[in-house]
UniProtKB/Swiss-Prot annotation:
It catalyses: CMP + ATP = CDP + ADP; dCMP + ATP = dCDP + ADP. The keyword Cytoplasm applies. GO terms for cellular component: cytosol. It comes from Coxiella burnetii (strain RSA 493 / Nine Mile phase I). The lineage of its organism: Bacteria, Pseudomonadati, Pseudomonadota, Gammaproteobacteria, Legionellales. Pfam families: Cytidylate_kin (PF02224). Transmembrane segments: none annotated. ATP binds at residues 15-23. It is an enzyme of class 2 (transferase). Belongs to the cytidylate kinase family. Type 1 subfamily. One of its GO terms (molecular function) is dCMP kinase activity. This is Cytidylate kinase.
């Protein structure tokens, strides 16, 4: 990068599971033709590797070795295309979407050793024309200099129902009470962890999506994008 050139602009969307951040991040990146960082994919890929190589959460030394050698690849990072995720040559695009992988990813992501290992990898997604990043600590830790930050939240029952419907639509038979219990446990873990807890950045736009449609949330976010003049740089290279 030219020393005089400003870093690529970043829009961050943080929030708990089921708040709608992933759906809106996809739509915004697709609209602007920017890169996308779905940080949850990275943690799920690490969880898959832990299960595949039989490295338990309690094995700090083994986990450190795994994080140093494992090769995670995310292809098609420009929106409009579905990402293909591989780990050490294995296509894990579908495997990481299982509830088991998600549960392990949630627990692994609470470990400082894991979050520190993926920090630079996440920052490397920052490329022109721009990046939309969604996760739990995108605006607070990974990209504190983001030009526009959002924090989505919603009632836990509504978030659980959204997740339940998503899994049902994918043909996965689950119970709503189990989904809500798991979601609330993840919330507790994400909010109380010692490193990068889930919370809004001080300068974030906070949106409660409980009673809002996807289109309403998308329109609200795009209004802020236009107000910052970011839509005007959508086609910059």
């Amino acid at each position: 990068m030219n020393a005089r050139q400003k870093p690529a602009p970043v829009i961050t969307i943080d929030g708990p599971s089921g708040s709608g951040k992933g759906t809106i991040a996809f739509r915004i990146a697709q609209t602007l033709n920017w890169y996308l960082l779905d940080s949850g994919i990275i943690y799920r890929a690490i969880a898959w590797a832990m299960a595949h190589y039989k490295v338990p959460l309690e094995d700090s030394a083994g986990l450190a070795r795994l994080l140093k050698r494992v090769q995670i690849s995310i292809e098609n990072r420009i929106l409009g295309k579905k990402a293909k995720i591989s780990c050490d040559g294995h296509d894990i695009t579908l495997a990481i979407r299982s509830e088991e992988c998600g549960a392990l990813a949630s627990r692994a992501s609470a470990l400082p050793i894991v979050r520190e290992a993926v920090l630079q990898y996440q920052r490397d997604f920052r490329q022109r024309p721009g990046l939309v990043a969604d996760g739990r600590d995108m605006g607070t830790v990974v990209f504190p200099d983001a030009v526009l930050k959002f924090y989505f939240d919603a009632d836990s029952q509504q978030r659980a129902y959204r997740r339940y419907k998503e899994l049902q639509d994918r043909g996965i038979n689950v119970s709503l009470p189990d989904i809500q219990e798991d979601l609330e446990e993840r919330d507790r873990r994400d909010i109380t962890r010692s490193i990068s807890p889930t919370k809004p950045a001080e300068d974030a736009v906070i949106i409660d999506t409980t009673h809002l449609s996807i289109e309403a949330v998308f329109a609200t976010v795009m209004n802020h994008v236009r107000q910052r003049g970011l839509a005007n740089v959508a086609n910059e290279k």
